[in-house]
C-alpha cells in the first residue's frame, strides 16, 4: 500500500502540474486555486486551466476578443481580472457560464458594446468594474439581476443618459462611480438629480458628474441642474375628411389623411402602426426639413415603388418628368414630416386600425382610429347609354358625396400654415392627390392617371384650336375677370405661385372624339384636365384633374420671373384653351433690407452733418490772432521803483535797529548809496542778473495788463500817492509833496 499510495500521489501532482498552461503560474493557497496569467502578452484566453481555479488573472495582455466558450472549463471562478487587456469585443454568452463570479474587472479596455444579458446569470456578483471603456449606453434592466452588487464603477465612459430606475434593483449598492461621462442634461436626466440627492450610495467626485450638452449647460454638475420644463407626450388624432359618425364607413376611392398632433417637452417622436388585412405596417415620419428658398416646407411625398416605405420629395421647384406619361408608382401610405399620414387611394385593403404613437424621454403615449371602407358597388350606369354617372344617383346620395363643396371650392389646408380660403391641390410631377371620379373605367384607373395626359401636344409649339394670351393680370394683384370660351380666369400671380379659377362650365363641355363640338362622348363623361407647362414648350410641370364642383386651383413651387402657360383640355386631346402668364420677379430680401437700412442711415445722418457744419462755422473766428511777447529794455524809473519797492529790501531794513533821535543827537541815519547796491548786485552771482531781468519783464507785463483797470494803473504809476504794500513812509517822506529826486540815468 505504501508504494502504491506514493505512486498515486505523484501521479496526481504530475496531473495538476500539467493542468496549468505554460505561460501561467498556478498556486493553491488556502483551499483556493490561483491562476496568474498577467503580463504574458496573451492574445487568447489560455486553454487547459485547472477546473477548480477560483481566481483568474488575465490583466495586461492583448486579448482583443473574449470568445463564447472561453471560460466553459473554469466555471468555479469567483474573481476574473481582465484590466488593461485591450479587450474590444465580448461575445454574447462568454461570461454567462461563470455563475459563481463575485468580482469582475474589465476596466481600462476598449469595449463599446457589452452583452448585458450575460449579467442575468451572475446573481452573485458583488464588484463590477467597467470604468475607462467606450460604453455609450446602459440599459435600464441591465443590472436588474444583481441584488448583491455592492460596488459599480462605470466612470470615464461615453454614457450620455441613464434610464430612470437603472439602480433601483441594486439593494446592496454602496459605492457608485459615474463621473467623467458626457451626459446630455435634458428632461431624461432630471431623475438622476433627485436620486443623487436622496440616496445613501457613495458618489465620489459629484462635481465631475457634469453635463457635456446642451451648450448652455455644459460643465454644470448634475446635482446643480436648474429646473427644466418637462412634459410627457400627449397625442391627438383627426381624420380628413372626417367621418360623419364614429364607425361610419368611408367611400372607396377617396384620398384619406390622418393628422397626428403630439405635444410634450422634449418634442416627441412619432411612429405610425397600421393593422390592416395584409399585416402590420410600421411607418416612421421623416425628419422635418428646413425651410427652402421660397419659405415653403416640403409637404407631399412621392413614392419610389415600395408600398410601405414613405418617401419625400425635397426639391423646392418641380422639374419636368423624364418620361411621360409613365408616372411613378403611387405608394399606399405616405408618412409626412409634419406627422400626417396620407392614403392616396382608399380601398378595402387599407381598412384597419391606425395608431399614432408619440415617445419622448419622459414616456410614451398613443391613440388609435378604426377605419372602415364601404364595399364598391356595381357600375351606376350601363355602358353606351350616354348618361353621366351622377344622372342616376339619388339626390340624397349625391348631396352626401359633395358635402362641404357647396361653395364650389374644395377646402384645403396646407401642411403647416393656412391663410384665407383653401384651394384644390394640384399634383406635382404626376402625383395623384385629387379625388378620383367614379366612371365605368374606375376600376382600371385606380392609382393611374389618364392615358397620355400630358403629351408634347399639350405643351409644345403645335397649333391648338384656340390660343389666348393675356398678360393684364400680371400688372396687379386684383382679380381681372378675363373670361374665355371655357371660362378660364387667372388671378393672384406671385413669385412662386399662381391661382387659376374656372367659371361654371356649360353642359356641352368641349368637343367630342370626332371633333364636333356638339357631340357628347357616349358612355362616359369626358375627363377634363388642367396642365401647367413652360411657355416655351416641353413636358408639363404640374397638372390636376378638373373635379366636379371645384373651380379654383393652386399651382405652387414655381420659378420667379418665368413664363408659364395654363392649358385646359380633355384627356388625350390637344389643348383647347391656353393662357400664358409670367411669375413675378423675386426681389432678394437681403437686398431690400440693405437698401432700406442705407436709406434710413442717410436720412438720419444728413441733418446731423448739417448741424455740425453750422456749429463749426459759428465757432470759427474771422481772423486768427497770436499773442507775441517781446522783451523790452527796462526803464530807469521802473528800475528804481522796483528797487525801492523790493520786499526783500524792506524786510532787511525793518530788521535793522535804528537809534532814537534823542540818543543819536538828532543825526539822521546815513543812506546807503544806491551805487553801492548796484555794485553789490553786479558783483554777485551772474544768475542774479537773469533773475533781475525776469523780474523786470514780469513787472512790465503786469503793468501792461493793469492798464485796463484805472485804479490798478494809478496804484502802480509813479504819480500815485498811494503807498505800495510793504513801503515805509520814512524812506519816501521827501517825495510826498512831489519833490522827486532826480537820479542819474
UniProtKB/Swiss-Prot annotation:
> Bias category Acidic residues: which stretches?
665-683
List the keywords (alphabetical): Cell membrane, Developmental protein, Disulfide bond, Glycoprotein, Immunoglobulin domain, Leucine-rich repeat, Membrane, Neurogenesis, Phosphoprotein, Repeat, Signal, Transmembrane, Transmembrane helix
Q: Where are the LRR repeats?
A: 52-73, 76-97, 100-123, 124-145, 148-169
Signal peptide segment: 1-19
Q: Which residues carry this modification: Phosphotyrosine?
A: 719
Q: Per the UniProt record, which residue ranges are transmembrane?
A: 590-610
Identify the residues that the record assigns to the LRRCT domain, covering every copy.
181-232
* Side Extracellular, residues: 20-589
Q: Where is this chain compositionally biased, Pro residues type?
A: 317-328
Glycosylated residues, chain numbering: 52, 73, 121, 338, 365, 474, 563
Describe tissue expression. Answer: At 11.5 dpc, expressed in spinal nerves, their roots and the ventral spinal cord. At 12.5 dpc, detected in the ventral spinal cord, dorsal root ganglia (DRG), dorsal and ventral roots and sympathetic chain ganglia. At 12.5 dpc, expressed in almost all motor neurons which also express RET and in almost all DRG sensory neurons which also express NTRK1. At 18.5 dpc, expressed only in a subset of NTRK1-expressing neurons but still expressed in nearly all RET-expressing neurons.
Q: Which residues carry this modification: Phosphoserine?
A: 720
Q: Which residue ranges have biased composition labelled Basic and acidic residues?
A: 290-300
Q: Which residues lie on this side of the membrane: Cytoplasmic?
A: 611-745
Location within or outside the cell: Cell membrane
Protein name, as recorded: Immunoglobulin superfamily containing leucine-rich repeat protein 2
Amino acid at each position: 500500500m505504501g508504494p502504491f499510495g506514493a505512486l498515486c500521489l505523484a501521479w496526481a501532482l504530475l496531473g495538476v502540474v500539467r493542468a496549468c498552461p505554460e505561460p501561467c503560474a498556478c498556486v493553491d493557497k488556502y483551499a483556493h486555486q490561483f491562476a496568474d496569467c498577467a503580463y504574458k502578452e496573451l492574445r487568447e484566453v489560455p486553454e487547459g486551466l485547472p477546473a477548480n481555479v477560483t481566481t483568474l488573472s488575465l490583466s495586461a495582455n492583448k486579448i482583443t476578443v473574449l470568445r463564447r466558450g472561453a471560460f466553459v472549463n473554469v466555471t468555479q471562478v469567483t474573481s476574473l481580472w481582465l484590466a488593461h487587456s485591450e479587450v474590444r469585443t465580448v461575445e454574447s454568452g462568454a461570461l454567462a457560464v461563470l455563475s459563481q463570479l463575485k468580482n469582475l474587472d474589465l476596466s481600462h479596455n476598449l469595449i463599446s458594446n457589452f452583452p448585458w444579458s450575460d449579467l442575468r446569470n451572475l446573481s452573485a456578483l458583488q464588484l463590477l468594474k467597467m470604468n475607462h471603456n467606450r460604453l455609450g449606453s446602459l440599459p435600464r434592466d441591465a443590472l436588474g439581476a444583481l441584488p448583491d452588487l455592492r460596488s459599480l464603477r462605470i466612470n470615464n465612459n461615453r454614457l450620455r443618459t441613464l434610464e430612470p430606475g437603472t439602480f433601483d434593483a441594486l439593494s446592496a449598492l454602496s459605492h457608485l462611480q459615474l463621473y467623467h461621462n458626457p451626459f446630455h442634461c435634458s428632461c431624461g436626466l432630471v431623475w438622476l438629480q433627485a436620486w443623487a440627492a436622496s440616496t445613501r450610495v457613495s458618489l465620489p467626485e459629484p462635481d465631475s458628474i457634469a453635463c457635456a450638452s446642451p451648450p448652455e449647460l455644459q460643465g454644470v454638475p448634475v446635482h446643480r441642474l436648474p429646473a427644466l420644463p418637462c412634459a410627457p407626450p400627449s397625442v391627438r388624432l383627426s381624420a380628413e375628411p372626417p367621418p360623419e359618425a364614429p364607425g361610419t364607413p368611408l367611400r372607396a376611392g377617396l384620398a384619406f389623411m390622418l393628422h397626428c398632433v403630439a405635444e410634450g417637452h422634449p418634442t416627441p417622436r412619432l411612429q405610425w402602426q397600421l393593422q390592416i388585412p395584409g399585416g402590420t405596417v410600421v411607418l416612421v415620419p421623416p425628419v422635418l426639413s428646413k425651410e427652402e428658398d421660397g419659405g415653403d416646407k416640403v409637404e407631399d411625398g412621392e413614392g419610389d415603388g415600395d408600398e410601405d416605405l414613405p418617401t419625400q420629395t425635397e426639391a423646392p421647384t418641380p422639374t419636368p418628368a423624364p418620361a411621360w406619361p409613365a408616372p411613378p408608382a403611387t405608394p399606399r401610405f405616405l408618412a409626412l414630416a409634419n406627422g400626417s399620414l396620407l392614403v392616396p387611394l382608399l380601398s378595402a385593403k387599407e381598412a384597419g386600425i391606425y395608431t399614432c404613437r408619440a415617445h419622448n424621454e419622459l414616456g410614451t403615449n398613443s391613440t388609435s382610429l378604426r377605419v372602415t371602407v364601404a364595399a364598391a358597388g356595381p357600375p351606376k350606369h350601363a355602358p353606351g347609354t350616354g348618361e353621366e354617372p351622377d344622372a342616376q344617383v339619388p339626390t340624397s346620395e349625391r348631396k352626401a358625396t359633395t358635402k362641404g363643396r357647396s361653395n364650389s371650392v374644395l377646402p384645403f389646408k396646407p401642411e403647416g400654415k393656412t391663410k384665407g380660403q383653401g384651394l384644390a391641390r394640384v399634383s406635382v410631377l404626376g402625383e395623384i392627390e385629387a379625388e378620383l371620379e367614379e366612371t365605368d373605367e374606375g376600376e382600371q384607373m385606380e392609382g393611374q392617371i389618364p392615358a397620355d395626359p400630358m403629351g408634347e401636344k399639350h405643351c409644345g409649339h403645335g397649333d391648338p384650336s384656340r390660343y389666348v394670351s393675356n398678360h393684364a393680370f400680371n400688372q396687379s394683384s386684383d382679380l381681372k375677370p378675363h373670361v374665355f370660351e371655357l371660362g378660364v380666369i387667372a388671378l393672384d400671380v406671385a413669385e412662386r405661385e399662381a391661382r387659376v379659377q374656372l367659371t361654371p362650365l356649360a353642359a356641352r363641355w368641349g368637343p367630342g372624339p370626332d371633333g364636333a363640338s356638339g357631340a357628347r362622348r357616349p358612355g362616359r363623361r369626358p375627363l377634363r384636365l388642367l396642365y401647367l407647362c413652360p411657355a416655351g414648350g416641353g413636358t408639363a410641370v404640374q397638372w390636376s384633374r378638373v373635379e366636379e364642383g371645384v373651380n379654383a386651383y393652386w399651382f405652387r413651387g414655381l420659378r420667379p420671373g418665368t413664363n408659364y402657360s395654363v392649358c385646359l383640355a380633355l384627356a388625350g386631346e390637344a389643348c383647347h384653351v391656353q393662357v400664358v402668364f409670367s411669375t413675378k420677379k423675386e426681389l432678394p430680401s437681403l437686398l431690400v433690407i440693405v437698401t432700406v437700412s442705407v436709406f434710413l442711415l442717410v436720412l438720419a445722418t444728413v441733418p446731423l452733418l448739417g448741424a455740425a457744419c453750422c456749429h463749426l462755422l459759428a465757432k470759427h473766428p474771422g481772423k486768427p490772432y497770436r499773442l507775441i511777447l517781446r522783451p523790452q529794455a527796462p526803464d530807469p524809473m521802473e528800475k528804481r521803483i522796483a528797487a525801492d519797492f523790493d520786499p526783500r529790501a524792506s524786510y532787511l531794513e525793518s530788521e535793522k535797529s535804528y537809534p532814537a533821535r534823542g540818543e543819536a543827537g538828532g543825526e539822521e541815519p546815513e543812506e546807503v548809496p544806491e551805487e553801492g547796491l548796484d555794485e553789490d548786485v553786479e558783483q554777485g552771482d551772474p544768475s542774479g542778473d537773469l533773475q533781475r531781468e525776469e523780474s523786470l519783464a514780469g513787472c512790465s507785463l503786469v503793468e501792461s495788463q493793469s492798464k485796463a483797470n484805472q485804479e490798478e494803473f494809478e496804484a502802480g504809476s509813479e504819480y500815485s500817492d498811494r503807498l505800495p504794500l510793504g513801503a515805509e513812509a520814512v524812506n519816501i517822506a521827501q517825495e510826498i509833496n512831489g519833490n522827486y529826486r532826480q537820479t542819474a540815468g
